[in-house]
Amino acid sequence: MKLIFLHGLPGVGKLTVARELAQLTGFPVFHNHLAVDLAGSVFEFGSPPFVELREKVWLATFSQAAAAGLDGLIFTFAYDRTVRGGFVNEVMKIVEGEGGEVLFAELRCSAEELERRIADLSRKR
């Protein structure tokens, strides 16, 4: 399995790029906020149980996808202070352990564009 690991600041366009890549590749998108929202519905953001549950969801998804023989998966990720230091290495270990490959792509944009994107109503919940 090819895991396309899109990372960058919040609002930089990871989900937009992921959706376009999904159209081109046929790979499903695993949006970071699916795990964040799940853990956050039960635990306070950043609390030890939140961090543990979020990471378990992320890693279990990668493990199951790789073991199931998916051709690929697109993951959106924004590092924050609550992410365990060894997380990325654990992702690589899981995917590569199943014969897969992790492809990292950092997304960036200008400060002006980032400010515009964050202010965009579509980002408000």
Per-range role (PLM):
Residues 3:
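Walker A (P-loop) ATP-phosphate-binding motif of ABC ATPase nucleotide-binding domains
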Residues 6:
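Hydrophobic anchor at the beta1->P-loop junction of P-loop NTPases
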Residues 95-125:
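A glycine- and Lys/Arg-enriched "phosphate-lid" helix/loop adjacent to the NTP-binding pocket
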Residues 35-36, 80, 108-113:
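Conserved nucleotide-binding/hydrolysis micro-motifs of P-loop NTPases
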Residues 16-66:
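Conserved substrate/cofactor phosphate-moiety recognition/catalytic segment
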Residues 70-75, 99-103:
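Loop/turn-to-beta-strand initiation segments
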Residues 10:
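The conserved Walker
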Residues 13:
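Conserved glycine(s) of the Walker
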